Amino acid sequence: MSHEILSVAVFVPLEGHEQSAIATVRELSSVLAKGGYSRDILYREPQGEYVLVRYWKSDDTRRAALEDAEAQRRWAKLAHEIRIVRVYESLEEISL
């Protein structure tokens, strides 16, 4: 049985690239959603850091997304628009 995998990325847009970076994140999120790979939520912290929360459908879909040419193009573009602060590839839920 597959379960969603939570990933979190914290990033800041490079100077002068905020609008293009957010547009690229939106494009990437759309590609991943249309491919059935994941669903995303984007948050902005008051000091300018962005937090991208991604729920991968499964480990298999995450691997498949890494091979998707449309997604690869967006990830490559983002590399020139943002600086990654922190990435959590897989977070496990702890029951409370």
Please identify what each model-predicted range represents.
Residues M1-L6, F11-V12, S38-V51, R74-L96:
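Glycine-rich beta-strand-turn "strand-cap" elements at beta-sheet edges
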Residues L14-G16, E45, K57-D59:
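Short coil/turn motifs at secondary-structure junctions
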